[in-house]
């Protein structure tokens, strides 16, 4: 996640300069990566945040880099990968609608871009011996403050199109509004799949409303791992709860995480990775972030997960201030 407040036409050069520094640390071949422009970090002045997943031990002996023929490429030479298969896990890096030179494809056509991206995701999975049915987690980063000519916002349209590629029960889905890497891009999607295990679709009727359609699970359990979809403060009629109150929404969000985990016989103490997406109107979101941390401390006093907090431009419905998803291990 990185911050760049300049013009879209200058964003690519900014990313390339930033990436030259990152290349000092990446191996070759490098990881599958997702890079999106966010509105900010928890504190003013912070410009970049990087998180990662690493596997070691015997799994390193079974690593397979996935670089399908026909995939898009970046605007500069980088050792990044489209995907990795490590044991029974497939990590799909952020996919965009671009060509071999990193030029945006399908500019002005959200449906084309969305379908291109799912085609790229499918290619990575296919080359890794997996399919869309194996996806447990899906992250949709869409162009904020954008609507189709019909008036439908981008998030809703993308999720509608996503129905073409999944059967029920679908993966755990999290969506939020950002800016993108190259001018003309409308979205970026990454995914994780686990092959050879029957997943447990987690659905709780006690959560209230949600922006994800019924196709998608509240969470997905596979073996000893549980992936919880993005949770927000929506009532059963999909109205915003605790309007204008980041603390109040965070309390609701964390209660929802706990309910989904309980459905898989887990507790908040089992969370190993927590992602928090924050919306705020001020210069920064320090006050909102501190309120969210207070809500977390009250909700899960004995839990100490790795946490990534990011300020995004928007969440799937106006008025939502907090979204959280997580990974838990038994």
What are these regions (language model features)?
Residues 3-136, 142-255, 259-272, 278-330:
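N-terminal presequence-like segments and the immediate start of the first folded domain
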């Amino acid at each position: 996640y990185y911050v760049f407040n300049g013009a879209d036409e200058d964003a690519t050069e900014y990313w390339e300069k930033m990436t030259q520094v990152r290349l000092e640390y990446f191996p070759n071949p490098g990881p599958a990566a997702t890079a999106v422009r966010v509105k900010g970090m928890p504190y003013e002045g912070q410009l970049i945040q990087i998180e990662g997943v690493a596997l070691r031990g015997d799994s390193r002996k079974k690593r397979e880099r996935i670089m399908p023929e026909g995939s898009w490429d970046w605007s500069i030479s980088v050792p990044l990968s489209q995907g990795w298969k490590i044991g029974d896990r497939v990590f799909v890096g952020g996919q965009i609608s671009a060509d071999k030179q990193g030029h945006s494809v399908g500019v002005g056509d959200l449906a084309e871009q969305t379908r291109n991206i799912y085609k790229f995701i499918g290619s990575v999975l296919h080359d890794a011996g997996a399919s869309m049915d194996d996806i447990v987690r899906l992250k949709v980063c869409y162009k904020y403050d954008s609507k189709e000519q019909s008036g439908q916002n981008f998030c809703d349209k993308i999720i509608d199109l996503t129905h073409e590629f999944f059967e029920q029960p679908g993966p755990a889905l999290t969506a939020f509004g950002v800016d993108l890497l190259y001018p003309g891009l409308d979205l970026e999607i990454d995914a994780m799949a686990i092959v050879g295990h029957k997943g447990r679709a987690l659905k709780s009727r006690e959560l209230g409303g949600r922006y994800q359609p019924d196709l998608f699970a509240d969470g997905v359990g596979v073996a000893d791992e549980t992936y919880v979809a993005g949770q927000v403060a929506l009532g059963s009629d999909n109205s915003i709860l605790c309007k204008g109150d980041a603390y109040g929404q965070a309390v609701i969000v964390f209660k929802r995480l706990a309910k989904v985990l309980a459905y898989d016989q887990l507790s908040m103490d089992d969370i190993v990775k927590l992602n928090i997406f924050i919306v705020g109107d001020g210069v920064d979101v320090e006050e909102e972030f501190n309120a969210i941390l207070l809500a977390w401390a009250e909700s899960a006093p004995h839990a100490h997960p790795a946490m990534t907090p990011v300020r995004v431009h928007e969440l799937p419905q106006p008025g939502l201030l907090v979204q959280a998803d997580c990974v838990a291990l038994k």
